């Protein structure tokens, strides 16, 4: 992504900006719109949300004049609006991937169920896809990335989110030939694994966010999802179920997230994890056996070794996303994508005693929380992927703290997400048995 500022200026001067279709105009989408308005060589001519009013509010926040907005209900109407210099606002997400002038689709919905449909339609329509929907990525990302490559388009995680920010450091370290010992993110407070939206309602109002979304962060689900995404993009593994989540400072990260034989918490090198105390930063701990390079790292104040730290003290979430969209078009590259075969799994852990006949709710709600384990362990125990849990009906009681298994379910709903996950599992050597 070198000189992307210059490339965007070139596109602006030629009148050929990168064109983005934005699906989801909530908190994330609002920031994307606002940021895009400041940028050269990039436009968002189509915005979708569940209501026209939400889409209009997002555009208003981005200082788009009301007379530059048009409500549309068809591809043809959207094309006409865009041709007249207006932003097409829609409530039907399927309009956006079908628009001929759109080069990149950004999924800012946060729904795995909707995300897979958006991805499939975008790939089929030959659009690059920016997957902000990390919950969808950890469920079916590998097969979506495979399908995108076969279609000649880019499937990518979003710059600004922790996974892509971590991968930026990981790519730097591995390109230089260093061995990655650990990669992770910071958390500001220890997890509250029993958190519910009700208990967090007041805090959510203060932060102007939904209680469900806040709960997903507080109960650890979001951290598990993000680090599972990193694992499946790198081959690094969770060292233990749920990760260690050790306390650390910026100065001690490389001393904590290293093998126990070196005084750290890891059973083995090559781990994904999270640290309490270094939010909002992300990090990579690396090492090298090369004596001259070790000496050079000491001279550059990287510490005495054997492990060294790369630290990015920020991740700007949605604010950075337009750069990923531009990168797909200008360079044909991703900000991060899954490997062909996943290595880790996000699993669902009961938050409270669950009863036979109950229908499981959404991530960040009341029934379960997300955790992480190796894919091998999840398959051995026949564990249900976190992204498939919503809407499942239980066939038996489940004690608090126990992972939910495929065989705990009355049945799996027949949804596009479930079908796509089955296809992904069939591409692996030992698929789980539903």
Segments (PLM) and residue ranges:
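C-terminal catalytic/substrate-binding lobe primarily of soluble NAD(P)-dependent oxidoreductases
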Residues: 2-11, 202-203, 207-434
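Short gly/pro/ser/thr-enriched loop/turn and capping motifs at secondary-structure boundaries
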Residues: 53-54, 136-141, 145, 162-166, ...
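Rossmann-fold NAD(P)-binding glycine/threonine-rich loop
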Residues: 109-125, 132-160
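Rossmann-like NAD(P)H-binding beta-loop-alpha module
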Residues: 148-152, 156-222
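Short acidic, glycine/serine/threonine-rich loops at helix termini
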Residues: 59-60, 141-144, 167-172, 185, ...
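N-terminal glycine-/serine-/threonine-rich beta1-alpha1-beta2 phosphate-ribose binding loop
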Residues: 1-121
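Short, ordered loop/turn segments at secondary-structure junctions
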Residues: 50-52, 94, 110-111, 133-137, ...
């Amino acid at each position: 992504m070198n000189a992307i500022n210059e490339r965007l200026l070139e596109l602006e001067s030629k009148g050929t900006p990168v064109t983005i279709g934005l699906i989801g105009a909530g908190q994330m989408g609002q920031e994307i719109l606002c940021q895009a308005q400041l940028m050269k060589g990039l436009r968002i001519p189509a915005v979708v949300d569940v209501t026209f009013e939400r889409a209009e509010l997002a555009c208003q926040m981005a200082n788009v004049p009301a007379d530059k907005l048009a409500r549309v209900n068809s591809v043809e109407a959207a094309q006409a609006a865009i041709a007249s210099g207006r932003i097409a606002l829609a409530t039907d997400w399927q309009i956006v991937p079908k628009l001929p002038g759109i080069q990149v689709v950004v999924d800012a919905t946060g729904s795995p169920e909707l995300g897979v449909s958006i991805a499939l339609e975008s790939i089929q329509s030959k659009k690059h896809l920016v997957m902000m929907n990390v919950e969808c990525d950890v469920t079916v990302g590998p097969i979506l990335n495979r399908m995108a490559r076969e279609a000649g388009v880019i499937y990518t995680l979003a710059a600004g989110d922790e996974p892509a920010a971590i991968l930026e450091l990981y790519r730097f370290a591995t390109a230089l030939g260093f061995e990655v010992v650990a990669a992770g993110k910071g958390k500001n407070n220890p997890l509250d694994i029993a958190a519910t939206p009700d208990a967090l309602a007041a805090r959510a109002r203060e932060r102007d966010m939904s209680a469900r979304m806040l709960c997903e962060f507080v109960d650890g689900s979001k951290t598990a999802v993000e680090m599972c995404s990193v694992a499946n993009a790198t081959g690094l593994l969770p060292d233990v179920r749920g990760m260690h989540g050790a306390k650390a400072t910026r100065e001690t990260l490389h001393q904590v997230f290293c093998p126990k034989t070196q005084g750290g918490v890891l059973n083995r090198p090559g781990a994904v994890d999270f640290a309490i105390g270094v939010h909002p930063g992300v990090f990579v701990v690396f090492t090298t056996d090369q004596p001259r390079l070790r000496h050079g790292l000491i001279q550059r104040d990287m510490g005495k070794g054997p492990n060294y730290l790369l630290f990015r003290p920020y991740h700007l979430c949605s604010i950075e996303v337009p750069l990923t969209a531009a990168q797909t078009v200008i360079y044909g590259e991703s900000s991060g994508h899954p490997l062909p075969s996943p290595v880790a799994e996000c699993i669902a852990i009961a938050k409270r005693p669950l009863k036979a006949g109950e229908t499981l709710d959404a991530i960040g709600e009341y029934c379960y929380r997300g955790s992480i384990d190796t894919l091998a362990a999840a398959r051995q125990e026949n564990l249900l992927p976190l992204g498939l849990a919503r809407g499942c009906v239980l066939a038996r009681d489940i004690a608090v703290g126990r992972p939910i298994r495929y065989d705990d379910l009355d049945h799996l709903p027949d949804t596009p997400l479930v079908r796509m996950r089955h296809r992904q599992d069939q591409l692996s050597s030992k698929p789980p048995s539903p």
